[in-house]
């Protein structure tokens, strides 16, 4: 336990000794802050505004600030009376000369220092300068203030400049940050744009805006697409015409098919000529001059077949090119019926040739 007592006693003694060694040089001169406007030590050392020591229970003095005693001797006598009952007031006398010099140098600035009970501005000159100073830059650059200048904004500016000052000093203007941010960047600062005449609405907010990209190529593209949609139908119509032409070509072979029976007759008659006697040749020559009833029948059949093929061709073309198209199935059926008739005619001709 004695060790602890020694430690405690030594620490307390060192703290007291450090307080006793405090001098005026360790304290900075007044720098515009209330913490450095005055200083009072245990030994009676003091500088700055010590007028509050003359008052009782914080009551202000009857004398004005300029008429207050500012000499170092009066302050020393006042402090000596106040701290007469102090234990260390008579023991510490270090640095009195330095304190006197500092009090002399700070006497002019102490005249402008306000009462310590009423805080914060230091002198009246700075207060007057701040009173005539302009508003903060954020408020002067606000578009709301610019917009109000044209509409009787002078009154509002006067009210803004007539902010109630604390203790005769212009305190820093601190508006509500939310209101300031809402007011800043108002739409009244935007240039007035004439409304468009082609259907675009005027933008009512910064977040909603309309962009005109000029004439668009979409109309030209759509017109080309519509044109391409009509072209295949025209091509199909031309294709139908080709089918009609093809129909005439497919139905034309009856004319070409009509020739082979004659060639066959000549081909058959050619090899049979040497075997036939001369009277047979004479009979053939007479038959050529006066055709036999069989040949007449064959010729009649040829003429009837040719007329039927012509009528079928014309009917097929009319059916193909008629506006009321009856469908591809009936057209195919009509085309398929005609070759059957042709083949039947060819068979009949062969039978006639055999009979001859």
Curated annotation (Swiss-Prot):
Is Cytoplasm included in the keywords of this UniProt record? yes
Q: Name one GO molecular function term.
A: RNA binding
> Could you confirm whether the keyword Cytoplasm appears in this record?
yes
InterPro entries to which the protein is assigned, alphabetical: Cdc42_effect-like (IPR029273), Cdc42_Effector_BORG/CEP (IPR051296), CRIB_dom (IPR000095)
- Modification N6-methyllysine occurs at: 5
Which residues does the record list as Phosphoserine (modified residue)?
A: 18, 64, 105, 109, 118, 138, 140, 142, 174, 292, 295
* Gene Ontology CC annotation, any one: cytoskeleton
Residue stretches of biased makeup (Acidic residues): 345-356
What tissues contain this protein? Not detected in any of the adult tissues tested. May be expressed only in fetal or embryonic tissues.
List keywords of the entry alphabetically: Cell shape, Cytoplasm, Cytoskeleton, Membrane, Methylation, Phosphoprotein
Name all CRIB domain ranges.
Answer: 27-41
* Compartments in which it is found: Endomembrane system; Cytoplasm, Cytoskeleton
Q: How does it assemble?
A: Interacts with CDC42 and RHOQ, in a GTP-dependent manner.
Q: What does this protein do?
A: Probably involved in the organization of the actin cytoskeleton. May act downstream of CDC42 to induce actin filament assembly leading to cell shape changes. Induces pseudopodia formation, when overexpressed in fibroblasts.
Q: Which family does it belong to?
A: Belongs to the BORG/CEP family.
Identify this protein by name.
Cdc42 effector protein 4
Which gene name belongs to this protein? Answer: CDC42EP4
């Amino acid at each position: 336990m004695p060790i602890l007592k020694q430690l405690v006693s030594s620490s307390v003694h060192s703290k007291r000794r450090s307080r006793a060694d405090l001098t005026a040089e360790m304290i900075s001169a007044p720098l515009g802050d209330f913490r450095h406007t005055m200083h009072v030590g245990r030994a009676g050392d003091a500088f700055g505004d010590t007028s509050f020591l003359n008052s009782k229970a914080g009551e202000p003095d009857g004398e004005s600030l300029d008429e207050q005693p500012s000499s170092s001797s009066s302050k020393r006598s006042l402090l000596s009376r106040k701290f007469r009952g102090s234990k260390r007031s008579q023991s510490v006398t270090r640095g009195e000369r330095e304190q006197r010099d500092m009090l002399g140098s700070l006497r002019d600035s102490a005249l402008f220092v306000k009462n310590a009970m009423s805080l914060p501005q230091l002198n009246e000159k700075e207060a007057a300068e701040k009173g005539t100073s302009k508003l903060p830059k954020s408020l002067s650059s606000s578009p709301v203030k610019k917009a109000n200048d044209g509409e009787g904004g002078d009154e509002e500016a006067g009210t803004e400049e007539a902010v109630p000052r604390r203790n005769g000093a212009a305190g820093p203007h601190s508006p509500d940050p939310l209101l300031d941010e809402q007011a800043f960047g108002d739409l009244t600062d935007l240039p007035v744009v004439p409304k468009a005449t082609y259907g675009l609405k005027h933008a009512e907010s910064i977040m909603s805006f309309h962009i005109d990209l000029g004439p668009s190529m979409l109309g030209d593209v759509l017109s080309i697409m519509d044109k391409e949609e009509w072209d295949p139908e025209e091509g199909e119509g031309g294709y139908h015409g080709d089918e009609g032409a093809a129909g005439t070509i497919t139905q034309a072979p009856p004319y070409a098919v009509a020739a082979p029976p004659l060639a066959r007759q000549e081909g058959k008659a050619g090899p049979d000529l040497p075997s036939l006697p001369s009277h047979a040749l004479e009979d053939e020559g007479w038959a050529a001059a006066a055709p036999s009833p069989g040949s007449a029948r064959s010729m009649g059949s040829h003429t009837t077949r040719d007329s039927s093929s012509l009528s079928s061709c014309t009917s097929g073309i009319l059916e193909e090119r008629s506006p009321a198209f009856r469908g591809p199935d009936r057209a195919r059926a009509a085309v398929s019926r005609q070759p059957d008739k042709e083949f039947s005619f060819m068979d009949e001709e062969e039978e006639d040739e055999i009979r001859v």
